[in-house]
């Protein structure tokens, strides 16, 4: 199986990385094209474009000004260890065994507004560019137009290379929209995570994001190969709920 997840806005370029192994992103020419557009924007323009504070806009303007090829261990970091948001708190990559990191390199793909698709050990320089950003480019008015079918084609190549027979979608809607599901070569299963709140099961954003990371970790640590095995996921009190599941939408619920 092949897993897709979202990136994170929060980054960590300080904590020592537990491996020296690294690879290069596959779409660096496209990334460079986007960076060239972003380099031309003043911080206040980035603030408007990204909906961030002046401080964050200045930080990212500086990031884009210093973004340069080639990537190496001195100026970049493996994606799996660079992202630090809720999904990656649940995944807890720094505590994965080497075998699980190797499994991640084969099975896990991170969708990215700037880099397209990243393998866990692909080096990346720090950035902020969410997939939903309306960045005018040569192909259209946003990043969905920029990437077009590139991400879908890339995932299909990964499917052929790895022999995966299903895609496990653990990405957010914002990022998964960049994939044309109708053109994927394999079926898709989308796990949903719901918590009991106010007498009803609801998607609570923070917990759902963390749970996506925990399920990714569960798949990698246990070397799962068949989608049915995912139904045994029980981390942090979640369990498969057949009554709330519908076709390829698999529900996992938790009571508090």
Curated annotation (Swiss-Prot):
InterPro entries: YaaA
GO BP annotation list: response to hydroperoxide
Residues of the signal peptide: none
Pfam family, any one: H2O2_YaaD
GO cellular component, one term: cytosol
Entry superkingdom: Bacteria
Family: Belongs to the UPF0246 family.
UniProt-listed HAMAP family: UPF0246
Name of the protein described by the UniProt record: UPF0246 protein HCH_04801
